[in-house]
Amino acid sequence: MILQNRTFDLNPNDIAGLELVCQTLRNRILEVVSANGGHLSSSLGAVELIVGMHALFDCQKNPFIFDTSHQAYAHKLLTGRFESFSTLRQFKGLSGFTKPSESAYDYFIAGHSSTSVSIGVGVAKAFCLKQALGMPIALLGDGSISAGIFYEALNELGDRKYPMIMILNDNEMSISTPIGALSKALSQLMKGPFYQSFRSKVKKILSTLPESVNYLASRFEESFKLITPGVFFEELGINYIGPINGHDLSAIIETLKLAKELKEPVLIHAQTLKGKGYKIAEGRYEKWHGVGPFDLDTGLSKKSKSAILSPTEAYSNTLLELAKKDEKIVGVTAAMPSGTGLDKLIDAYPLRFFDVAIAEQHALTSSSAMAKEGFKPFVSIYSTFLQRAYDSIVHDACISSLPIKLAIDRAGIVGEDGETHQGLLDVSYLRSIPNMVIFAPRDNETLKNAVRFANEHDSSPCAFRYPRGSFVLKEGVFEPSGFVLGQSELLKKEGEILLIGYGNGVGRAHLVQLALKEKNIECALLDLRFLKPLDPNLSAIVAPYQKLYVFSDNYKLGGVASAILEFLSEQNILKPVKSFEIIDEFIMHGNTALVEKSLGLDTESLTDAILKDLGQER
């Protein structure tokens, strides 16, 4: 447990004192996020809600569960991390999300959306079985109500009536504008006036009526429900209170007191302003959701924009270019149009763009149906979020061999977001699925060719991956070439050992190749390109070389080296193969270069490892 290193007086009866605490927390959040980067606007918008929670509840007896948890900065500051908050998202510093190994006050790991109510239901069930005092309190926000798991949890909660408080932090935005009929309908319902006290008075009056008019009274009550903003939740058996002003501490405190006394499932609807307290961010939701270091006075980024396109930009530009000529191309994303680059397709062809909200499983299944109808759906998705849709990939796309195209962004180590966001699993779980074609580009130019190949491939689902930020391999080092199904590319033939790169691993292998050349060791270099199917000529390609070294940004177990070893084994070829992939553990947050160095994946460490394997000193 991290001990308290700054004392806050959170007296629920001293609203003025709580407001001063809120200002102190906002100032600290702005100070640190402007220096380190992080999730700014969500955390600023949730300050009063979190202060109210801490003022009334002991979070070790009443677990606080933060949905996604990127809005939990105020919680960290209130639980012994005020001074250490300066290390936010830094290597070996504080995580940007709740993390139980960091603090006993962080109840559950989080990073992906919409899990909080499900976790809360599990806690409530356990508390009932243990006859424990207290109840879980979930803070939801940023579009979590668009995901299926939220409604799955509500379904059980409303039926079982477990004591639980849910606070819906409604800032009318997820990461970008919320999508879907449910979000829109709930948003409209929730913009009405505060009905709770009026409804209580109506119920009181109805209870005094004689039994002879009970039927009419009950009909009036049912009719009244239809005009209240909480009808959706109350029909599920969940008490609804709100809307309230999520920045009014008096309203927050009184509402939490009421919810606490009910000892039933309660949803408090709180309306907040994303970016509250920082005028530059207020009203500019998507730009200020997740930010890099910026100047606090001007709001301008401290990092100049690179002249080199990011992989995401290279992908989206190519897709837009193809979409102009091919009306069958459609773009699909799960609440990440800007992050995946599909915002360009929205502007150019709005009818051919589909943001399905935070519903990855639906994204994959509906795309499979579009593919069956002759369209070419490019599902643009982060590697970490694709894992939420695994069954849809298997059941709905691959069994029927429907030609969806998975454009897997943020593949590999992603840096400051850490364990919950690393893109390290897709290689292992996708290559185990029949009918799936898997390939990876080595730089922006071959990424463009990968998009073109995917567009033409119509016999099965296919997937290609690319990193966040930039490729390791610089532009123009090797001539770009088109993709041919199952064909690798030998970039350098001469040498006694062979370095095999897959995707971004080609750039890493090339840097090692140059470092070894300075030691008078010549290495051949192979761009594997296709992981599935592997090049049928691979056994002949590797035959001249004494040892093989494999480089790729994914987990080692079930990874690229495993695929190569399986292939060679089936050919009865015994060849030493050493893997430089990711070890079998969840990788922490931090600057990507520092994280890679800690894993021995920087050029110097890789070169030393090969020299040692060859029996030579550096």
Swiss-Prot record:
Cofactor descriptive note: Binds 1 Mg(2+) ion per subunit.
Q: Where does thiamine diphosphate bind?
A: 70, 111-113, 143-144, 171, 278, 360
**UniProt entry keywords in alphabetical sequence:** Isoprene biosynthesis, Magnesium, Metal-binding, Thiamine biosynthesis, Thiamine pyrophosphate, Transferase
Q: Answer yes or no on keyword Magnesium.
A: yes
Q: Does the keyword Transcription apply?
A: no
- Extract one GO molecular function annotation from the record: magnesium ion binding
What EC number(s) are associated with this protein in UniProt? 2.2.1.7
Q: Which domain of life is it from?
A: Bacteria
Q: Looking at the Swiss-Prot or TrEMBL record, what is one Pfam family this protein matches?
A: Transket_pyr
Q: Known catalysed reaction(s)?
A: D-glyceraldehyde 3-phosphate + pyruvate + H(+) = 1-deoxy-D-xylulose 5-phosphate + CO2
Q: GO biological process: any one?
A: 1-deoxy-D-xylulose 5-phosphate biosynthetic process
Subunit structure and binding partners: Homodimer.
In the record, the note on similarity to other proteins reads: Belongs to the transketolase family. DXPS subfamily.
Q: What is this protein called?
A: 1-deoxy-D-xylulose-5-phosphate synthase
Organism, as annotated: Helicobacter pylori (strain G27)
